[in-house]
Structures are given as C-alpha cells and as structure tokens.
Curated annotation (Swiss-Prot):
GO terms for biological process: NAD metabolic process; NADP biosynthetic process. The active site is at D45. This is NAD kinase. It comes from Shouchella clausii (strain KSM-K16). GO terms for molecular function: ATP binding; metal ion binding; NAD binding; NAD+ kinase activity. Its cofactor is a divalent metal cation. It is found in: Cytoplasm. It holds the Pfam family NAD_kinase. GO terms for cellular component: cytoplasm. Its EC number is 2.7.1.23. Its main location: cytoplasm. Belongs to the NAD kinase family. It comes from the Bacteria.
Length: 267
C-alpha cells in the first residue's frame, strides 16, 4: 500500500508525521505523494481540507484519515496519543471505506469569454459581493425560485453543514443524505424585496443555479479557499451534488452524531 502524510506545520504535527512515515516505511509500505492509496493528515480541519484538494483529482483511488492536533478536528478520527494504534491498524488491518457526498460548483462567465471552471467542495462554497449587495436569481431545476438580495449565499454539503452553514443558522445534515443546503447571509427583506429567509435543502437530483443580476465584483470561495475567478465577469454559478465522493479510511466505528456531539456539545 502507498501512503503519504500531510502536516499542519507545527512542531507536534511534524514530529508525528516523521514517526508515522518512519514506522510505515519500516513495515514495507511505500511512500508516494503523487499516487497514494491513503493520505494521513496530522493537524486540524484546515490541514484535512488542503489534503483533500491536493488529491481531488484521484478521489476514487485515495482514502483519507486524520489525526487531530489543530483547533478543529471534525474530520479526524484519532488524537496524538493514539498514533501508535493508528500506525498498527494501517500496517495490519484492512480499512473500511466510508463515503461522504461532495458539492460540484461550476462557474460560467458572461458572453462565454472564458471556459467554465469546475470545482469540488468538501464543506461549502460561498458567493459574496465585494461592493454593495449581491443580487441574483435563484433557480431550482431550471425554474426561477426567488431573487436574492443581501451579503451572499452559502451552499454546503451534509458534512459541511456543521461549518459555515451552522453559523448561518442552517441545519446539520447526516452525510447519508446526498444533498446540498443553501443558506442566506444577511438577506434584505422588506415590503419590496422578499426571499424565503430560510435554509433550503435540495436532494441529489436537483440543480441550483445562481444568476447574477447586478454588475458587481464577487468573491467565490471553495472550502474557505478563495477561488481565482475573474470576479467582474461571473455570469452564473451552478451547484449540485457531485458524482464524486470523498473516501474516508475507517479503522473503527465513529458515528456521525457522536462526532457532532464531541465537536459542539461535549466539554
């Protein structure tokens, strides 16, 4: 089996990465940062997201497992004190694959001047105006649903529903529900302008299309990473459940709701 490790960059994470690499090489596993079968992240969710995007082009061949040394560890199954146990499992135990849905984001430009850009998000994608309010038509399955006016919109995956979406008052969804959630950022609602004012949950076969109506520059993010878009020329942003899925290497049960409880409720 081929592996690679990704570190948060602090002293503890780097030391754990060195230990993992040394032990796995001694067990005749091959280190391959180009085509790994398993990616071991040591850090927080930021480290995990960076690793995910580094290998988003080979999700069918690569599985991920994380050790939590950062601030947030929603995607990490292990803590530093369990590193030796994880190493032993990787060497000796076939892992179970658990798959989570992803978000597909396609950005198109006015007049077809540039090629559409396709991205995958593990947590969410956001669109915000960099000057004034964002005004866009929201279409669902090709039908106009509403005209949004406000600071921006957040489109999240079920696992990403625990991140920015939660801060916006969105619901937490179990990853077995292949869906996307659309949440508003400071929408304008008065006797002239109306939006639903509530998060929307769309099933796998529904596509959501955002058509920009006002001539403003926008900022698009994928998992909080700024996307290099030509901000002044964005025409539409299409989101739906992606065909690809992220694959987690599970060596022991870690139910989703237990993960939610430990992240947000347990002291």
């Amino acid at each position: 089996m081929k592996f690679t490790v990704a570190s948060r960059g602090d002293t503890l994470s780097d030391e754990l990465c060195d230990t993992i690499k040394t032990r796995l090489l001694a067990a005749d596993l091959a280190h391959d940062s180009d085509k790994p079968d398993i990616v071991i992240t040591v850090g927080g969710d930021g480290t995990f997201l960076e690793a995910f995007h580094s290998y988003a082009h080979r999700l069918e061949e690569t599985a991920f497992v994380g050790i939590h040394t950062g601030h947030l560890g929603f995607y990490a199954d292990w803590v530093p004190e369990e590193t030796e146990h994880l190493i032993t499992h990787i060497i000796k135990t076939p892992f179970q694959i658990v798959e989570y849905p992803l978000l597909e984001v396609v950005i198109r430009y006015r007049g077809g001047q540039r090629e559409p850009r396709r991205h995958l998000a593990l947590n969410e994608s956001t669109i915000k105006s960099t000057e004034g309010s964002l005004v866009c038509t929201v279409e669902i399955k090709g039908e106009a649903f509403e005209t949004f006016r406000g600071d921006g919109l957040c489109m999240s995956t079920p696992s990403g529903s625990t991140a920015y979406n939660k801060a916006l008052g969105g619901a937490i969804l179990h990853p077995s529900l292949a869906s996307i959630q659309l949440s508003e950022m400071a929408s304008i609602n008065n006797r002239i302008y109306r939006t639903l004012g509530s998060p929307l949950v769309l099933p796998q076969h529904h596509t959501c299309l955002l058509k920009l109506l006002n001539d403003v520059s926008v900022q698009v993010t994928i998992d909080h990473f700024n996307v290099p878009v030509f901000a002044e020329n964005v025409d539409t942003i299409q989101v739906r459940v992606a065909e690809e899925k992220v694959r987690f290497a599970r060596f022991r049960p870690f139910p989703f709701w237990k993960r939610v409880k430990e992240a947000f409720i347990s002291e």
